[in-house]
Amino acid sequence: MAKAQKGARTKKKERKNIASGIAHIHSTFNNTLITITDTHGNSISWGSAGAQGFKGSRKSTPFAAQMAAENAGKKAMDHGMRNLEVRLKGPGSGRESALRALAAIGFNISHVQDVTPIPHNGCRPPKRRRV
């Protein structure tokens, strides 16, 4: 196994001065993923309910989505981001709480867009669950 050399220099993440970007909130029934990108789509920061330490059914809660959004938002603010455009995708319970969390930590939200994919009668859906 390779060992880290003593006194080896590690590359520090450089601060990108980006004023505005896009927050993609993907909320499923099981988890909530928040990715903050610049206007070209290059990823700046991300967070998810699972990455925050929530496991199992706790990942699908609005509180977990709020914590994930705060984490991703603070990382993006470290790069100088202040203005956000928000794109929501999916049917999950963490959509609104993630959006509120981003607004609460000081982002200027210009507009909110729902980009949930809706089929024009495409693939056959999975069969109904019988519990």
From Swiss-Prot:
GO cellular component, one term: ribosome
Claim: rRNA-binding is one of the keywords in the record: yes
Entry annotated with the keyword Ribosomal protein: yes
Keywords: Ribonucleoprotein, Ribosomal protein, RNA-binding, rRNA-binding
InterPro entries on file: Ribosomal_uS11, Ribosomal_uS11_bac-type, Ribosomal_uS11_CS, Ribosomal_uS11_sf
One Gene Ontology term from the biological process aspect of the record: translation
A GO MF term: structural constituent of ribosome
HAMAP family per record: Ribosomal_uS11 (MF_01310)
Role noted for this protein: Located on the platform of the 30S subunit, it bridges several disparate RNA helices of the 16S rRNA. Forms part of the Shine-Dalgarno cleft in the 70S ribosome.
Assigned protein family: Belongs to the universal ribosomal protein uS11 family.
Subunit structure: Part of the 30S ribosomal subunit. Interacts with proteins S7 and S18. Binds to IF-3.
NCBIfam families, per database record: PRK05309.1, uS11_bact
Protein name, per record: Small ribosomal subunit protein uS11
